[in-house]
Design a protein with these regions (language model features):
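Short, aromatic/basic amphipathic alpha-helical patches
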Residues: 49-56, 117-119, 142-143
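Short, well-ordered beta-strand core segments
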Residues: 102, 129, 150-152
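Structured adenosyl-cofactor binding patch, chiefly the S-adenosyl-L-methionine
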Residues: 135-192
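Long, charge-patterned amphipathic alpha-helical coiled-coil/hairpin "stalk" segments used as oligomerization
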Residues: 106-115, 119-138
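Structural alpha-helical scaffold elements that stabilize or flank donor/cofactor-binding regions
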Residues: 95-96, 123, 143
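Helix N-cap and loop-to-helix transition residues
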Residues: 57, 89, 113, 139-140, ...
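RNA substrate-binding interface of SAM-dependent RNA methyltransferases
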Residues: 1-109, 172-180, 191
């Protein structure tokens, strides 16, 4: 593994598991106000269904991922698609989502805080928040070219699931208050 390029960004599905557990257990996701995608270093896109409940056991999650990468699809017992794997670059994923704004979250971003980043995300009708799921390092150039503003929400490097928890909580608070920069009360959807 260490001989592969960008080896520090490989081999840590536990980070993705923690991040997904955090995002998929939020009221935003449960109320279908959050869409979640995973983009891999090997240019694979994982689309997550609105009703997915991720296994809490890492070992069950690992088996699920093996099945997904083998079959390109995970279905429920009723036949509903829960996860779908396809080929695509990060730019392809942005084209699929079609957000008005793509916000990166990185320890090397412009210093801010979770509340201000959430307010910025809420200022657009359809925002995407991008959090790196690797042990160390930063976004590749292929990713940064598709990002809009990139922020750091702490003066120390935070783990991906902590960043997700803080940002999504701030988004929930704004939605509960009905804050809308244009004065209307329309529901917003955030992609992560």
């Amino acid at each position: 593994m260490k001989r592969l390029s960008d080896s520090w960004k490989r081999g840590r599905p536990d980070i993705v598991h923690f991040a997904l557990m955090e995002a998929l257990s939020t009221p935003l996701f449960m109320n279908m106000m959050l869409r979640v995608y995973v983009h891999t270093i090997n240019d694979k896109i994982i689309a997550i269904a609105d009703n997915l409940r991720i296994p809490k056991s890492y070992f069950r999650f690992e088996r699920l991922m093996v099945s997904l990468f083998r079959d390109n699809l995970i279905k429920s017992n009723e036949g509903a698609i829960l996860m779908e794997l396809s080929d695509g670059t990060f730019a392809d994923l942005v084209d699929i989502i079609k957000p008005d704004m793509v916000i990166g979250l990185s320890s090397v971003g412009v210093q801010s805080n979770a509340q201000k980043v959430a307010e910025n995300a809420q200022s657009a009708d359809h925002s995407s928040l991008v959090v790196g799921g690797f042990a160390k390092g930063h976004f590749s150039e292929n990713v940064t070219t598709s990002l809009g503003p990139t922020y750091s929400i702490s003066n120390i490097a935070l783990e991906a699931h902590v960043v997700i928890a803080r940002i999504l909580y701030e988004c929930e608070k704004l939605l509960e208050k009905g804050i809308d920069h244009e004065g209307d009360k329309k529901s917003r959807q955030i992609g992560a």
